[in-house]
Amino acid sequence: MAPPAASQRYPSPSQPSGKSEVSDLKTQLRQLAGSRAPGVDDSKRDLYKKVISYMTIGIDVSSVFGEMVMCSATSDIVLKKMCYLYVGNYAKGNPDLSLLTINFLQRDCKDEDPMIRGLALRSLCSLRVPNLVEYLVGPLGSGLKDNNSYVRTIAVTGVLKLYHISPSTCIDADFPATLKSLMLHDSDAQVVANCLSALQEIWSLEASHSEEACREKESLLSKPVIYYFLNRIKEFNEWAQCLILELAVKYVPSDSNDIFDIMNLLEDRLQHANGAVVLATVKVFLQLTLSMTDVHQQVYERIKSPLLTLVSSGSPEQSYAILSHLHLLVVRAPFIFAADYKHFYCQYNEPSYVKKLKLEMLTAVANESNTYEIVTELCEYAANVDIAIARESIRAVGKIALQQYDVNAIVDRLLQFLEMEKDYVTAETLVLVKDLLRKYPQWSHDCISVVGGISSKNIQEPKAKAALIWMLGEYAQDMSDAPYVLENLIENWEEEHSAEVRLHLLTAAMKCFFKRAPETQKALGTALAAGIADFHQDVHDRALFYYRVLQYDVHVAERVVSPPKQAVSVFADTQSSEIKDRVFDEFNSLSVIYQKPSYMFTDKEHRGPFEFSDEVGNISITPEASSDIVPAQQYEANDKDLLLGIDEKDENKGVSNNNGSAYTAPSLESSSNITSQMQELAISGPATSATTPQSFGFDDLFGLGLSTAPAPTPSPPLLKLNARAALDPGAFQQKWRQLPISLTQECSVNPQGIAALTVPQSLIKHMQSHSIHCIASGGQSPNFKFFFFAQKESEPSNYLTECIINTSSAKAQIKVKADEQSTCQAFTTVFETALSKFGMP
């Protein structure tokens, strides 16, 4: 029998068929509102359940608001819970009706049952109606003094809710001071934890416009408070323990004894069953001992066992999180984990994401003593049914080979992969063989003899085909059929969709031409003609360049395209050391899982106010080389600032440099003179103009004859700065937008300082020793940007500084904004003096 049509189907009994059913509910609730008959509470429960059910599936039942409130006059806690849930959901959208709930909620806040008092207080604070905040102050004050810890816990959270609704009401009622007192004296651990969480959030938000809040926030990091929490840490639940440990990370110990005392207090937390607590403890240990090399290494030894235990005992998801943190530690100290490499062997039932991470860790811990065992294990994975893991295992073998561990055996293993006759194995192996030949040219005979037997028709992946073409061009003299294979590939130019492959074809044809000209001349002509007509800009430009350089001089073209082979000693890492250090600073966060700093995967508006300068995300600066742009304006054009808004950037666009000349776009005529200008430079040789400012670049460090004298030191500073100055990032951002630019200046940075920039946090620590504090930093070579702030010792006067250092020119662009314009020049002198000493012994 066919089902009835949609229009003839009966409505589900769990869903209202229309407004009539909601009206029926309203009528039934009104009838039960004043009834005291036996079983009335059961009837109310059934009706409440229907209302809540409709509400959860998105049906508007706000019309029964009044009836729900009238039926709440009962001692049944289940009814009250459902009523509170309903009221909290509809109160914000019905502020007028919310007034009806105030009386019964305030009455319930005084109930004899602490559970009802707590539930009522939580519901009262969840109304989120600004007009009703005056009714929250009294119940919250009573709740904070309640004898029952559950009510106090709810009241503390309610204070934070009140602050978000009306900050002034919360501050005027002196609730933060009450929370601080509770935090330091309450006997219940959950109340203390809630107080800490609420105060951190309130004071962080208040610090942007209140110096008192800044001081209060700093007081959380005082030694008595930190030790108070650490001594009681066993009383707290896992969430609260993580909160306390995160606070302890920011504490600056006074001496080494302080460090050892904290580690002794937290020693047993490393054995905790909760992985979050263990990772938070590990972060404390690592951060405390960063300046103590020997102890830091011992910490690695100590934390190794707990982390490996968590990896083997948890779910795949937990194992992955722990492994991600272990991977970070393994990369920083591989020798400590070298003996434990078997812990990173893949299990057959593990998810692919766990296996992939373990393969990376096996690559990191490989050394002379364990390479054979690790490579043997990796070769087994190459036959894995999971193609992604098979590819990763082959790449891992290649990475180990590039580390110069047991190269002979590894090359033999890689060449054996080519005999497996699996497309993806062959493709990955060809890419690795190419890299091996770049580093170990002496293996060319063995590799080429095997690679020469591979048909290019069987290679479909662009990277693998590009690697094969590179070998055909680089070793054309050793491969008898190289010109003919290249000719066949060039004839199918139109069928090749990868620009990378077409670029390699052009270069390989050129190289083969210089080694076997008669056999390659026709193919080269075809390739150049096809390349010049190619729609891809890079392919077109390279073909045109090759054509013109061949027209100019064949011998010059050979020196340019096919110079003598030089072995590559080191391959570029995928991540800079600065990125890795930033991820390490964000240990026990998503940054470790994603293997990138938080500023790379969070939106600007969601980053929030960071509490300390070393936690403010990097400021991305695009290092575009434009010789026509004066330095100060170049950085403005490339700025992707985290701290400055659009208005501030627009304001600065018209600011001229210290010579008084604003940026002007280069004319088209200037580009036509580039060649002649380069010729003039080539003829003039090393001679320099007497008026040209001396450049202190990296060449000075390598003894190339340039002067290494430091920049002249400015006159001694006359301004005294506050060594303990504090300024919240939010306040810095607000001031930076409001204050005008007081001074813009350029100064030189000595070569030692340029070299010292490679050490993470080096400039930040140096300037801090001169009472100038960093609030944000970032960039990538050659441009690095820093934002500093300082305060006068005698009065709260702020100096905000933007400093952009270009390592190529060894120049620093300084922009200062000050509360007191009269002392701006004096501060600039102090700043330049400190900067001139950077990197000096």
UniProtKB/Swiss-Prot annotation:
Gene3D superfamilies documented for this protein = Leucine-rich Repeat Variant, TATA-Binding Protein
Question: In the UniProt record, what gene is named as encoding this protein?
Answer: BETAA-AD
What ranges does the record list as Polar residues composition bias? 9-25, 654-671
Q: Does the keyword Protein transport apply?
A: yes
UniProt keyword tRNA processing, yes or no: no
Q: Which UniProt keywords apply?
A: Cytoplasmic vesicle, Golgi apparatus, Membrane, Protein transport, Transport
Q: Which GO terms describe its biological process?
A: intracellular protein transport; vesicle-mediated transport
Regarding protein family, the annotation reads: Belongs to the adaptor complexes large subunit family.
Checking PANTHER family in the record gives: ADAPTOR COMPLEX SUBUNIT BETA FAMILY MEMBER
What name does UniProt use for this protein? Beta-adaptin-like protein A
Q: Which organism is it from?
A: Arabidopsis thaliana (Mouse-ear cress)
For this record, an example GO cellular component is:
clathrin adaptor complex
Q: Name one GO molecular function term.
A: clathrin binding
Q: Relate the assembly described in the record.
A: Adaptor protein complexes are heterotetramers composed of two large adaptins (beta-type subunit and alpha-type or delta-type or epsilon-type or gamma-type subunit), a medium adaptin (mu-type subunit) and a small adaptin (sigma-type subunit). Interacts with AHK2.
Tree of life domain: Eukaryota
Q: InterPro entries given for it?
A: AP_beta, AP_complex_bsu_1_2_4, ARM-like, ARM-type_fold, B-adaptin_app_sub_C, Clathrin/coatomer_adapt-like_N, TBP_dom_sf
An example of a Pfam family matching this protein is Adaptin_N
**Cited SMART domains:** B2-adapt-app_C
What membrane topology does the UniProt entry give?
Peripheral membrane protein
Q: Where is this region: Disordered?
A: 1-25, 650-671
Q: Can you say where in the cell this protein is located?
A: Golgi apparatus; Golgi apparatus, trans-Golgi network; Cytoplasmic vesicle, Clathrin-coated vesicle membrane
The entry's function note states: Subunit of clathrin-associated adaptor protein complex that plays a role in protein sorting in the late-Golgi/trans-Golgi network (TGN) and/or endosomes. The AP complexes mediate both the recruitment of clathrin to membranes and the recognition of sorting signals within the cytosolic tails of transmembrane cargo molecules.
